[in-house]
Amino acid sequence: EYLRNLKNINLSDEDFNKIFLKKKKIALFALHYEPEAATNILGKNFNDQVLAIETLSKLLNDEWLILVKEHKDPPQSYKFRGNLFFERLKKIDNLYFINKDYKLTEIIEKADLISTITGTAGWEAINLGKKCLVFGNAWYQEIYGCTKYNDELTYDKFSKELNIPFDNQKFKES
């Protein structure tokens, strides 16, 4: 079932390369293993990863595309990503599901925003000079370059923050 769903939703390599030619901003959402403490405990209200992705889609406007990347080695995730998981993702118009074999750092370097619940993808992003948005209680959420989602966060408020160039000095001092 998992493999069939992947086949139906995965973006082809050719289409993946075309995404970066579009005149849209790219937000990467890196999926977690399931089950995992990073989502089940630290994710708080966002222990449902699709809910976090749906919230991200509502937060960003139509200038954005969302790339959802499967964890590179989901040993048991296939048991927890059933039909409903993929059906909900398919309902998000600006979303593309990408192959787990793409290197995360290469996508981070091309993306405008990295989003995760609490994962190391956010930490990797700010270390590479990219802004990140976390939905759970990530250990790095107070560090410069990272924004923690809350219900009061609006696109206008968030876009102002995103438009400020990343300041490596502030990151090093935080």
Which sequence ranges carry the predicted segments?
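A short, aliphatic-rich alpha-helical micro-motif
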Residues: 21, 90, 108-109
